[in-house]
Structures are given as structure tokens and as C-alpha cells.
Amino acid sequence: MTVLTQPPEHFVFMKVGNHARENFDSILERKLKEYETTGKIFWGYGGVTCHPIHQVQPFARQFEKKGSLYLIMQYIDSNADPDLVPATQYSIDGITWHPIPRGITVTGSRYAMILSEIKPGDLIIYPSEYEVAVGRRRGRSADEYLRGHVDKGCFAKKLPSRAKKDKANQIKTSYQAEIVEPYSVFVR
């Protein structure tokens, strides 16, 4: 995987941190072992944004011909404490279910992003230069979309005539990973 030194034209953004009584460093260490063992990572997440079928998979298909799709992660101090039961199955379509591959653990999540290796990589993202690329909020400026409790989204660069670099509203990110097929799945 190539570590990005400039923000990409399109990406999935996610705030990440401690989860299910596990600190973020432990999660990263576990996920790197998953990658070494299986060649992929199931990065669990929940919430109402970045639904596998309605947002992530269509977004990935829309941009796959333009190059790799990345998950860009911003570390935050999180106290997410969901159910600790590990998922045992995943589904691409929400209908047909398969066992989670041996060596992969997804805890306290409804969905999982399918990733290659997670790499450190500092980027500065200006959300005002991007817009929501799929779903009901398509076309909405990413800076407006991320206000409040929204912690993830599928974003694409705005047309130059609509983009403005708002230096007061920047996001510093610390980690990145390439999103690989099937991009995002349901887990249970």
C-alpha cells in the first residue's frame, strides 16, 4: 500500500479511538496481526452513516476506476463501550452470511470496512473542499456534514468553483488504509 502524502480526491473518513474496552493502540496491534495472518482487516464500525449497501459499496464502485479508495482515520479520545460479543458471521448483501475468517475479530460493531494494512500517515484534510458523494446527503459540504455527532462519511473533492480551503476548519488525520473488495460488510 502506498502511504498518501496528500489528501486523495475521494475517500472514506472515520473518527477512530478506544472501543469496546480496548485502547486504540491495542486495536491497531491486533489489526496488524490480522493483516499478517489473513491478508486483510475487518475494521468494525456502527452508526447510521457509511451503510455497506447504501453508501460504501456504491461509493467504492463509483470511484474504483479512478484508483485506490482509502479509509482516512482521525484519532479521537473515545469512550465507546458497546456489547463485547465478537461477530461470527459477515454478509456482503445482508442476506447471505459467511463465517468470519479465522484470525479476524470484530467486536461491538454492526458493519466492517474491509482493509489492507493500516499505516501511519499524517494528512491535513480541509472538509470544506469535499462533499458527501453518496446517499441522501449527496452534495452536502463535508464540513457541514461532520458537525455534531457524525463521525464518518464517503467524500469526494468538490468542483474547484465550489471548493474553498477553510484553514480554521481542518482535520488532522493519523492513519490510513486501502479499502478492498467487498469494501464494507454487515457483521453479526
What are these regions (language model features)?
Residues 9, 66-71, 79, 109-111:
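Short, surface-exposed beta-edge/turn micro-motifs
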Residues 1-22, 26, 92-188:
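Contiguous surface segments at macromolecular interaction interfaces
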Residues 79-90:
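Short beta-strand-centered aromatic/proline hotspots
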Residues 6, 55-57, 62, 74, ...:
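Residue-identity detector for glutamine
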Residues 17-77:
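Acidic, glycine-rich low-complexity segments with interspersed aromatic residues
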